[in-house]
């Protein structure tokens, strides 16, 4: 019988990787707590219409990449391909929009049927922030600063912020007509995908990865040139506030977000840790989405970062600077004590001691192999624990445990098993030298 494997693009997270993810999530959780951003959790499965209406029928996400199916009630359901639409749906459904401005964050898996590659899988994970009910240029910059400062706190180096303004729907409509006319005159120079997008979603051509198309677009009209005076003034405010906060940025007039609901400020944050500028975070303003989904007109801005790409960047940062924040983040904390035990009576006593110490708040790793003491001590050394708690049948019969220091010179200490508080005190102290231990005897 053949061995079962995970689906292509659906990757297991093993314990070492999971520790890194938990460390990133812990930093993010604390970062958001200090900013007054509250966590929200939404279902993985939503009605397909949510994304068709929210993301846009003409997008690649809806047209080519969603995992959709009919359930037993003949309802079309979709595994969420992104987090924003679900958060907005939840805020509408539960009346959060009636309670004033909302700052929400989420973390979890998303699903898109794409070609798997490093840092980009079919099941991928995001950490995202959605600020609902805020309309000012200042709120745009606060959202950008939240993302920028989180990445800096995680130890990501070589950060670069790119910004653009997508203006209002009216601005984009005027620009769309101008861009289409310009591109139609050069249709034969476009790649096949861009030729198709010319009629379905022409703004997405600006984001083409085709080098020939990108070279052609160097002379194309820009959206910034089509902004109304009000939109241009708003974007100038965003830039001024970024300068005020000392967050460096550059204008990218070709920057468009991949989803239809974006308008006004759009941004991406990249890092050069992987050798080339790789996008680790993207977002923007989406004032029309709530109304598009059947709710009241509600201004909003948000962003998301991809965990898989971020972890690759952090691993590169840790290698480049072994003493830096990224390296510290990816290190796992060792147990405080490793319990070495052998013998039928000893194993039962060791289990009781382990539980008592854990209940007292001590991080304990119990060796359950039953191997010879020599092999267990090798594992104890590899664990990084500063102490080994040794229990053989002799110690079990005498009702004692032998505490042996592993990371520095020091004498063994024998303590009664009936006094776990004394054992905890020793474990939380520096090991004593052999001479000190002999004097106490």
From Swiss-Prot:
SUPFAM superfamilies attached to this UniProt entry: Class II aaRS ABD-related, Class II aaRS and biotin synthetases
GO biological process: histidyl-tRNA aminoacylation
Superkingdom classification of source: Bacteria
Keyword Metal-binding: no
Family: Belongs to the class-II aminoacyl-tRNA synthetase family.
GO cellular component, one term: cytoplasm
Transmembrane feature ranges: none
PANTHER family hit by this protein: HISTIDINE--TRNA LIGASE, MITOCHONDRIAL-RELATED, HISTIDYL-TRNA SYNTHETASE
Compartment(s): Cytoplasm
Keyword set includes Ligase: yes
Classification via InterPro entries: aa-tRNA-synth_II, aa-tRNA-synth_II/BPL/LPL, Anticodon-bd, Anticodon-bd_dom_sf, His-tRNA-ligase, HisRS-like_core, HisRS/HisZ, HisRS_anticodon
Catalytic activity: tRNA(His) + L-histidine + ATP = L-histidyl-tRNA(His) + AMP + diphosphate + H(+)
Subunit and partners: Homodimer.
Keywords: Aminoacyl-tRNA synthetase, ATP-binding, Cytoplasm, Ligase, Nucleotide-binding, Protein biosynthesis
Protein's UniProt name: Histidine--tRNA ligase
